[in-house]
UniProtKB/Swiss-Prot annotation:
Annotated residues for binding of Mg(2+): D449, D451, D453
Subunit structure, as described in the record: The RNAP catalytic core consists of 2 alpha, 1 beta, 1 beta' and 1 omega subunit. When a sigma factor is associated with the core the holoenzyme is formed, which can initiate transcription.
Family matches, as CDD domains: RNAP_beta'_C, RNAP_beta'_N
InterPro entries tied to this protein: DNA-dir_RpoC_beta_prime, DNA-dir_RpoC_beta_prime_bact, RNA_pol_asu, RNA_pol_N, RNA_pol_Rpb1_1, RNA_pol_Rpb1_3, RNA_pol_Rpb1_3_sf, RNA_pol_Rpb1_4
Key words, A-Z: DNA-directed RNA polymerase, Magnesium, Metal-binding, Nucleotidyltransferase, Transcription, Transferase, Zinc
Pfam families, per database record: RNA_pol_Rpb1_1, RNA_pol_Rpb1_2, RNA_pol_Rpb1_3, RNA_pol_Rpb1_4, RNA_pol_Rpb1_5
Organism for this UniProt entry: Staphylococcus aureus (strain NCTC 8325 / PS 47)
Descriptive protein name: DNA-directed RNA polymerase subunit beta'
Length: 1207
């Protein structure tokens, strides 16, 4: 066997007949498979042991030689070699075909490679190959052109006129002769000459033909090898035949297909020996051709061959294709050993890095480890004995199991695994019951809940795998989300509610204004019921020993609440005392106004002071997230995870103590709701009157009505929130961020508002009732539309989003950080991303965590804030924006010069760790997951505002797909291709609008539809590529008009726009990585003196290499233009044929690769997974695995003896 980790590339090509024979261990002559009585393979049949090897290990067929000692012997009775039965997976056979047969991939694929090479149409080829016409191979004196087709009658006529003086053949034989006569060098010269003169269709065809001829010439494949004389037979274990209960056999379809080929081939041989009439032989040859076609690709031509029950048989091509094919089913995704799955339950007592494993499951998973330990401790005498102990579940087994699982992490995975946080490592602890216990804080990362979700457990076996699981995958290490660098393990639901309740303050709380000496007194008083959690009290500031308090402050009393004192105990000591939910308090110091000088208090003491003070907001989910981020920035990951655990415990404890619950009485209907509705009803009547008088159009009326009712709902919502008691349980749930929001509350107590019809158009009749009052029948009916559409959308969205992620991963999987610095001289100019006046992504967020490309000085003081190639930390980013700088050049994946992947400097910091990114990080996959994972949160809808076609804009998931697939967008904007001034805007025919732009040398007019809004004015100066009407720009056109940089920035902005509008934050760098992959290729315009072909797609680096070579030899360089490919197209155009074939269109990719004799250098991740190597990323990178050890220091003993001498 080959050592998988030790080969560097994989090459594919056409197999010559000699090659096929060299692979084979013998010819299969009979169609028989297994003798049904003896169940032994038939001799010379499809399962023959003499050809493929023995069915039993170390035993020949007749049983003369058994046991290993005869290894390598060939039995003299049955001719079977004594060896392992595994060879039946490796040894191939062959069939000697009685007539040449064409390979369907090369004749039928699009474009037909045979057709291009012979310059014949696929129709003509088909007629020849399937014996409908003759093709002239050697015209002789007939005056016919070579390759002319002759019908049966024409052939007879010529044959009678010129007997034996010309050659015309039928079937693959004729084509084979023509292919053998091709002189590739001669063809190449002719085609190169034709390129100079041809135009239009002829030029395109010439380029296509040139490509095929070049492919054959460079790869060393001979054209005639596209015709088969010998057919290889794959090893029998790969097309098995198994006996079912009841004596019937189940067999792979391939055996049926091979059997048909062998039967027809043998019949043809017999007919040829008998000298049968030509027409019978021809028919048999055609049937043989069809049998081989069905074997290679059933159903590609004509009706597929069917098995029992009219089911089309699965041919060799089908074995590779699609989700169930070899690539995706067996090579890219395998089932794994040492795994289990079960329902998950919450484990609130677990630490951040732990999970609970059911005892039985743990015993089964760690069985071999336990057995080894039992034998080592001499509890069991041997392995067999240990096994039976485990099966009996003896008492001593559990102690050993405890020992074995200590320090041995396991991986937990929840499907669907949308991003890398869908698999994390935990240290197992044994639990009773049969459910896996999961830490409540990691549920957000897994998107898990405990309503019956299941999770899978995997055991990392090797020491290296365990080390990686512990160092890199442990849940306590994965606190930040790779998509935006914010904490992903934020408390949710109960935990949020508990901490919110804990930090709440109330005016009417018991013993407000009591003053205590220290926190211990406070806790005692709370335990004895003297004060409540919400009581506002004073504590001597000096008792806190807080390093951020000034001397002045330590002499005073800190005004706070009992709950906040308890909350602050979980915060690290070096932090300021957190008394209010502000960044100022969190990052710097406790505001001075909370420190009270006891001498200034009046007679009422602190109680009087509190009566005049406003209550402080409690801590909501967002603020808890900020606390976690701040702790993470200042401390180690370990400290952060410990604090998270404490926050979790606090949350659960106090949400239980609070006993918050919801009853009907908590939903208070707004008293003056009817009044608000009446006012808006009057406004609607006014609009209707205006419409009836013809003052406004139907469209304006509809939009006005929708606006009025939206405003009514907003007003009711605003007043509801004002009128609510701050301790109302529903308000607390929504305000804390635990569950629900203001809009849910409005629907419960205010009004439901406007609903959408099934078409997506908003129904102008609002639902004025709330759920508390109850809906009328009509209102209920209207609301069912939305609910139904919501459910249907969710189902579709999940599938769509998953497919988008798959395409994204595929296009970016080979982007890995390959070097420290690529030394580029270009940078990307960044500033705020705005849409009109609305801010989409601020400048400060875009530069933080990136490397600068220029020196930035403070505009006033002229001090240097940052130099080129330095990392922009949050502090520096703040300095830059505070200095009033609004744009700067940064290093970006767009401008990176790294050949494969990106470099550290152009990528910036790794968002998952907050440190600089390391060489070997698979940033492409991370980018794809970061963009794909929130896909399910995006909406599916195209919003219809009043059914006007012009103003429908695609948003959400469809828009993201549109951008990444580089499709023509819906609602396309008109852009100007010249720089100049808008000269005129006028109505054109067919209700269109015409915009005239006058440039320096030319004037152009652009047509826009009558409904589209024009956003330029007459006399306004416009740049190339500027938008004239509202809508989305078509990116491919924009690339040719505005150039590469503008297109990159535009695509980035558009993606950010969609995600940010849905409230999803994704870092720019992920989008940059994806867009860069879409712009990797250029299309050659003129080849110059290089070897490139005009019109072909070439990787940008190959193009620059070819030109560099040309310049070196003082030759003419090639010219090219950048091309924007959609992600599907870009995946299929990658340099690696293994990656492309396992993605989509498997047969097309492999056909093309075989003809070109492509070699795959295994640079990406997929290729290496397919052939079973370690992936070249992370610890699998060659620079990490090829570490050489050198002893530089002398052994200690030697050093000591020398020191004695010198003394």
């Amino acid at each position: 066997m080959i050592d998988v980790n030790n080969f560097h590339y994989m090459k594919i090509g056409l197999a010559s007949p000699e090659k096929i024979r060299s692979w084979s261990f013998g010819e299969v002559k009979k169609p028989e498979t297994i003798n049904y009585r003896t169940l032994k393979p038939e001799k010379d049949g499809l399962f023959c042991e003499r050809i493929f090897g023995p069915t039993k290990d170390w035993e020949c067929s007749c049983g003369k030689y058994k046991r290993v000692r005869y290894k390598g012997m060939v039995c003299d009775r049955c001719g079977v070699e004594v060896t392992k039965s595994k060879v039946r997976r490796e040894r191939m056979g062959h069939i000697e075909l009685a007539a040449p047969v064409s390979h369907i991939w090369y004749f039928k694929g699009i474009p037909s490679r045979m057709g291009l090479l012979l310059d014949m149409s696929p129709r003509a080829l088909e007629e020849v190959i399937y014996f409908a016409s003759y093709v002239v191979v050697d015209p002789g004196p007939t005056g016919l052109e070579k390759k002319t087709l002759l019908s049966e009658a024409e052939f007879r006529d010529y044959y009678d006129k010129y007997p034996g003086q010309f050659v015309a053949k039928m079937g693959a034989e004729g084509i084979k002769d023509l292919l053998e006569e091709i002189d590739l060098d001669e063809e190449l010269k002719l085609l190169r000459d034709e390129l100079e003169s041809a135009t239009g269709q002829r030029l395109t065809r010439a380029i296509k033909r040139l490509e095929v001829v070049e492919s054959f010439r460079n790869s060393g494949n001979k054209p005639s090898w596209m015709i088969l004389d010998v057919l290889p037979i794959i090893p029998p274990e790969i097309r098995p035949m198994v006996q079912l209960d009841g004596g019937r056999f189940a067999t792979s379809d391939l055996n049926d297909l091979y059997r048909r080929v062998i039967n027809r081939n043998n019949r043809l041989k017999r007919l040829l020996d008998l000298g049968a009439p030509g027409i019978i032989v021809q028919n048999e040859k055609r049937m043989l051709q069809e049998a081989v076609d069905a074997l290679i690709d059933n159903g590609r031509r004509g009706r597929p061959v069917t098995g029992p029950g009219n089911r089309p048989l699965k041919s060799l091509s089908h074995m590779l294709k699609g989700k169930q094919g070899r690539f995706r089913q067996n090579l890219l995704g395998k089932r794994v050993d040492y795994s289990g799955r079960s329902v998950i339950a919450v484990g609130p007592s677990l630490k951040m890095y732990q999970c609970g494993l059911p005892k039985e499951m743990a015993l089964e998973l760690f069985k071999p480890f336990v057995m080894k330990e039992l034998v080592q401790r001499e509890i069991a005498t041997n392995i067999k004995n240990a096994k039976s102990k485990i099966e009996r579940m003896d008492d001593e087994v559990w102690d050993v199991l405890e020992e074995v699982i200590r320090e041995h992490p396991v991986l937990l995975n929840r499907a669907p695994t949308l991003h890398r946080l869908g698999i994390q490592a935990f240290e197992p602890t044994l639990v009773e019951g049969r459910a896996i216990r999961l830490h409540p804080l990691v549920t957000t990362a897994y998107n898990a809940d405990f309503d019956g979700d299941q999770m899978a457990v995997h055991v990392p076996l090797s020491k290296e795998a365990q080390a990686e699981a512990r160092m890199l995958m442990l849940a306590a290490q994965n606190i930040l989300n790779p998509k935006d660098g914010k904490p992903v393990v934020t408390p949710s639901q109960d935990m949020v509610l508990g901490n919110y309740y804990l930090t709440l303050e109330r005016k009417d709380a018991v013993n407000t204004g009591a003053i205590f000496n220290n926190t211990n007194e406070v806790l005692k008083a709370y335990a004895n019921g003297f004060v409540h959690l919400h009581t506002r009290i004073g504590v001597h500031a000096s008792s806190f020993n807080n390093p951020t308090f000034t001397e002045e402050q330590n002499k005073k009393i800190l005004a706070t609440s009992v709950g906040k004192i308890i909350f602050n105990e979980i915060i690290p000591d070096s932090f300021a005392y957190i008394n209010e939910p502000t960044q100022e308090n969190l990052e710097r110091k406790t505001p001075n106004r909370y420190f009270i000088d006891p001498t200034t208090l009046g007679e009422g003491g602190l109680k009087e002071y509190f009566e005049n003070e406003e209550l402080i907001e409690p801590f909501n989910k967002k603020f808890l997230g900020n606390i976690i981020a701040e702790v993470f920035n200042r401390f180690s990951i370990t400290d952060t995870s410990m604090m998270l655990d404490r926050m979790k415990d606090l949350g659960f404890k106090f949400s239980s103590k609070a006993g918050i619950t919801v009853g009907v009485a908590d939903i208070v209907v707004l008293p003056d709701k009817q009044q608000i509705l009446d006012e808006h009803e009057k406004l609607v009547d006014r609009i209707t009157k205006q419409f009836n008088r013809g003052l406004i159009t139907e469209e304006e009326r509809y939009n006005a009505v929708v606006e009025i009712w939206t405003d009514a709902k907003d007003q009711i919502q605003g007043e509801l929130m004002q009128s609510l008691d701050k301790t109302n349980p529903i308000f607390m749930m929504s305000d804390s961020g635990a569950r629900g929001n203001a809009s849910n509350f409005t629907q419960l107590a205010g009004m439901r508002g406007l609903m959408a019809a099934p078409s997506g158009k908003i129904i102008e009749l609002p639902i004025t009732s709330s759920f508390r009052e109850g809906l009328t029948v009509l209102e209920y009916f209207i609301s069912t539309h939305g609910a139904r559409k919501g459910l249907a959308d969710t189902a579709l969205k999940t599938a769509d989003s998953g497919y988008l992620t798959r395409r994204l991963v595929d296009v970016a999987q080979d982007v890995i950080v390959r070097e420290e610095d690529c030394g580029t001289d270009r940078g990307l100019l960044v500033s705020d991303i705005k849409e009109g006046t609305e801010m989409i992504e601020p400048f400060i967020e875009r530069i933080e965590g990136r490397y600068s490309k220029e020196t930035i000085r403070h505009p006033e003081t002229d001090e240097i804030i940052i130099r080129p190639d330095e990392l922009i930390t949050p502090e520096i980013a703040k300095k830059i924006t505070d200095a009033g700088i609004e744009q700067m050049y940064i290093r970006s994946a767009f401008t990176c010069n790294a050949r494969h992947g990106v470099c550290e400097k152009c990528y910036g910091k790794n968002l998952a760790t907050g440190e600089k990114v390391e060489v070997g990080e698979a940033v492409g996959t991370i980018a794809a997951q970061s963009i794909g994972e929130p896909g399910t949160q995006l909406t599916m809808r195209t919003f219809h505002t009043g059914g006007v076609a012009g103003s429908d804009i695609t948003q959400g998931l469809p828009r993201i797909q549109e951008i990444f697939e580089a499709r023509n967008p819906k609602g396309q904007a008109v852009i100007t291709e010249i720089e100049g001034v808008v000269e005129d805007i006028k109505l054109a025919k067919d209700r269109q609008q015409e915009i005239v732009v006058k440039g320096a040398n030319e004037t152009r007019s652009y047509l826009a539809s009558g409904t589209s809004r024009i956003i330029v004015e007459i006399g306004q100066p416009v740049q190339r590529g500027e938008v004239l009407t509202e809508g989305s720009i078509e990116p491919k056109n924009y690339l040719s008009v505005a150039g590469l940089n503008a297109t990159e920035s535009y695509l980035l902005k558009e993606v950010q726009k969609v995600y940010r509008m849905q409230g999803v934050e994704i870092d720019d760098k992920h989008v940059e990585v994806m867009v860069r992959q879409m712009l990797r290729k250029v299309r050659i315009i003129e080849a110059g003196d290089t070897k490139l072909l005009p019109g072909s797609l070439v990787d940008i680096h190959n193009f620059t290499d070819a030109n560099r070579e040309a310049f070196k030899h003082r030759k003419r360089p090639a010219t090219a233009k950048p091309v924007l490919l959609g992600i599907t197209k870009a995946s299929l155009e990658t340099e690696s044929f293994l990656s492309a074939a396992s993605f989509q269109e498997t047969t097309r990719v492999l056909t093309d690769a075989a003809i070109k004799g492509k070699r795959d250098d295994l640079l990406g991740l997929k290729e290496n997974v397919i052939i079973g190597k370690l992936i070249p990323a992370g610890t699998g990178m060659r620079r990490y695995s090829d570490v050489k050890y050198e002893k530089t220091a002398k052994p200690v003993a030697e050093v000591e003896s020398q020191t004695e001498v010198t003394e």
